[in-house]
Amino acid sequence: FKKSKVEVVAAVEDTPYSVPKDIITKKDINELKNLIKTIATEKNTQIFENGVKSITSKLLEYGIEKELSQLLGEGIDELDEVGKELLKKRIKAFLGAPQPLDSGKSKKVLFIGPTGVGKTTTVAKIASHLILNEGKKVMLVTADVFRIAAYEQIKSYGDILGVPVRVVSNVFEFHKLQPEFKNYDVVLIDTAGRSHKDEKRVNELKTFMKYAECDEIYLCLSATTRPQDLKEVIKKYDFAGNYKLIFTKLDETDNYSSILNAVYYSGQPISYFTNGQIVPDDLMLADSEIIFSSIVKGY
């Protein structure tokens, strides 16, 4: 793919524009991000692409990060049927195919995230899916010993699903459970929600993750998270390395810019969306169509 180009109003020479692309790669995003940062050092510099300022503005107003709005809107003159179809393809290509849990490869699966995102309920939904739809033997483990009634909550789910639930307060207790793990296809590990500003709790999680040696990690985030908070959370959980994103509470907002922005900030793939409290019904594979429909609603 050719490198995306932008026009600076104050520039002396005109810059040619690239042909609109159907597929956007992470390389394209990084190139555009670096280019815009270089050009936009002057406070009053205005940046826009040929014929797409209005479309880019719509994406910005929706809440999408500036550089990503610029890239998604490149070459789209208006949101007519052709423009909508191109935007839909770009959003789908940017997010990529959802990457759900592979129960055939992953044994120990860890779920992390801030407080209040509905992590425990999400774990229960995935456990239910594995049991009812894939016929897997599942064990639930909770490392949440901080929240009042945390164990009772996940234990109630375990009782309903007919699966064992174990509680651990540290990684040493977790390792003592290893002999039991061999009797199950998948072990889902719930952790305490941690504020990204609570250094002590975050460091405890780092230690647990280092020695737990889990096969997959999922970062649970709420679709209602404020933009600045989202950026800080993504940065704080950077230590997790390779992980997948789960977005919860889609039923509590009509704006899903946080999903696009989180993928943009982190470079990590999405897996699931949740849109309610019902176990197991309110769980779905991440779907770019939902985000696109929200953006173009009213056009």
Where do the protein language model's features map onto the residues?
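Switch II (G3) loop of P-loop NTPases
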Residues: 112-115, 134, 138-149, 158-204
